[in-house]
């Protein structure tokens, strides 16, 4: 959760909690853009002639700053940066434009994501780096993003978006037949989705070819896609909805198809095991890498949220899944019948919290329900509100110079739901000095398998993660049939 900042308040209640539910259900696996990383060439799409990346402009500088702000800033690790630089140099030399220059920024985020700006600025999150098991897997991601730059996909997509916007305005101006208008708008959206998919397929073909010519194992792409799919499955199993069901306009094929296409594409260049994986060097480079959330921005441990920098903590009831985002901490209860949002706002010191709750930032607040309360010594106020599908309980709590909001929603308000909401708010307290000093990030630790070790025994050493055996398999690229043997090197997560 970001530190306090002025922000425009959401006025639509359903929109507020639709966003909260979406963020919580996606969690780690879908915060990484599964659709963006494809690895197969697609028949029927003519390749775009590679071009030089666009020059740096004030707009791209602003975009770079926005990306850093959204992803926790940059992550500095000289050893890891050296490995990435060496990898990119090999890829550039093997690309269609070896004269171009790329700069890679490691983002301080546990999300699994990678993307590129037209200028050749590439971004990878440390969450993606932690998930990859060798240099060839990372190279497949970097080559894919380089391909987007070479093919000038961002500029082409912008042109397509402008055309789609014109169509949308024309349809809206016609306005005579609602059914026809809806159909036309849907077709426009599907056309855009199909166009994005075409770009992804083109980047797949270019990227796998670059990796193969750089002598990396081109099958690293399919292995990494499999790891992403398994990560998403872990997330879906603990969240209230399957992330893939949340976007019906997604044009990307199911992950098994992506993996199959990646394998078919790689076979054009190499047989399995022929290219370089560079696993040992990669594991050495990521040893001690921060895993998951950065404590400086707050972090989730089970049902607790702790923010050592701001000095507070709270805990949600059993059955809630918490997710810390850049804007707020959001949570959803199993089954999706209850949701919550926790964030920070600026409220003038002279304005009472009760007046703030009734100031119009949320619609349909029952003013008669407003009451002043004290929570663990902190002045607070609470009220109820109602929407079409949700019933709300809201709190404002003054902590130092800032005001924190708890916004709870239930599809059906019951004494039990109201009690669980109150329990959450009443758990808000200051962290002790000892708790602040003990708040350390989780880290990737590389260990050597000893005689007698098993996947289960190694996974039992994992700390701070759910489903440790499954998480261990995903982190190390293992499936249900995999085993370990002495002297193997594997990743575990430790505190």
Regions found by a protein language model. Name each.
Residues 104, 112, 122-123, 244, ...:
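Surface-exposed aromatic
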Residues 313, 319-321, 454, 489:
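Residue-level marker of beta-strand positions
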Residues 341, 357-405:
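Signature of long, low-cysteine stretches enriched in small and polar/charged residues
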Residues 433-466, 488:
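Primarily a LysM-type cell-wall glycan-binding module
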Residues 139, 322, 406-443:
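Surface-exposed amphipathic alpha-helical segments
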Residues 2-4, 12-18, 28-314, 321, ...:
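A Zn2+-metalloprotease active-site environment signal
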Residues 468-495:
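Extracellular LysM carbohydrate-binding repeats and other cell-envelope/extracellular binding modules
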């Amino acid at each position: 959760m970001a530190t306090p900042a002025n922000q425009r308040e959401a006025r639509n209640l359903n929109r507020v909690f639709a966003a909260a539910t979406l963020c919580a259900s996606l969690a780690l696996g879908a915060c990484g853009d599964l659709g963006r990383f494809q690895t197969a060439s697609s028949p029927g799409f003519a390749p775009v002639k590679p071009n030089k990346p666009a020059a740096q402009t004030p707009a791209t500088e602003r975009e770079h700053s926005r990306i850093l702000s959204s992803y926790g800033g940059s992550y500095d690790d000289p050893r890891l940066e050296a490995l990435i630089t060496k990898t990119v140099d090999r890829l550039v030399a093997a690309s269609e434009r070896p004269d171009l220059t790329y700069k890679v920024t490691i983002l301080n985020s546990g999300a699994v994501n990678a993307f590129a700006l037209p200028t050749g600025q590439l971004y990878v999150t440390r969450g993606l780096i932690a998930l990859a098991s060798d240099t060839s897997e990372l190279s497949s991601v970097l080559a894919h993003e380089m391909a987007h730059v070479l093919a000038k996909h961002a500029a082409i997509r912008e042109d397509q978006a402008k055309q789609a916007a014109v169509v949308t305005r024309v349809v809206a101006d016609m306005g005579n037949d609602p059914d026809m208008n809806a159909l036309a708008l849907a077709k426009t959206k599907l056309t855009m989705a199909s166009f994005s998919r075409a770009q992804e397929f083109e980047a797949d073909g270019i990227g796998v070819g670059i990796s193969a010519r750089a002598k990396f194992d081109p099958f690293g792409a399919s292995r990494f896609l499999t790891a992403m799919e398994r990560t998403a499955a872990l997330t879906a199993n603990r969240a209230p909805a399957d992330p893939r069901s949340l976007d019906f306009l997604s044009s990307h094929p199911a992950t098994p198809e992506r993996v199959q296409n990646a394998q078919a594409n790689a076979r054009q260049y190499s047989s399995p095991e022929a290219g370089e994986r560079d696993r040992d060097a990669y594991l050495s480079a990521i040893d001690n890498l921060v895993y998951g959330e950065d404590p400086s921005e707050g972090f989730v441990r089970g049902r607790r949220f702790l923010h050592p920098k701001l000095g507070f903590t709270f805990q949600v009831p059993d059955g809630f899944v918490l997710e810390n985002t850049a804007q707020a901490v959001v949570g959803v209860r199993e089954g999706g019948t209850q949701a919550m949002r926790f964030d920070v706002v600026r409220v003038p010191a002279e304005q009472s919290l009760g007046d703030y709750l009734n100031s119009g930032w949320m619609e349909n607040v029952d003013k008669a329900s407003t009451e002043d309360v004290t929570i663990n010594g902190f002045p607070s106020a609470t009220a109820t509100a109602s929407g079409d599908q949700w019933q709300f309980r809201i709190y404002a709590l003054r902590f130092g110079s800032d005001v924190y909001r708890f916004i709870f929603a239930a599809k059906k308000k019951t004494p039990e739901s109201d009690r669980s909401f109150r329990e959450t708010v009443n758990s808000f307290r200051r962290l002790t000095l000892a708790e602040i000093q003990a708040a350390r990030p989780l880290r990737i630790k590389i260990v050597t398998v000893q005689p007698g070790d098993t996947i289960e025994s190694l996974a039992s050493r994992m700390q701070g993660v759910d489903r440790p055996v499954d998480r261990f398999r995903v982190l190390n690229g293992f499936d249900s049939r995999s085993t370990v043997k002495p002297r193997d090197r594997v990743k575990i997560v430790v505190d």
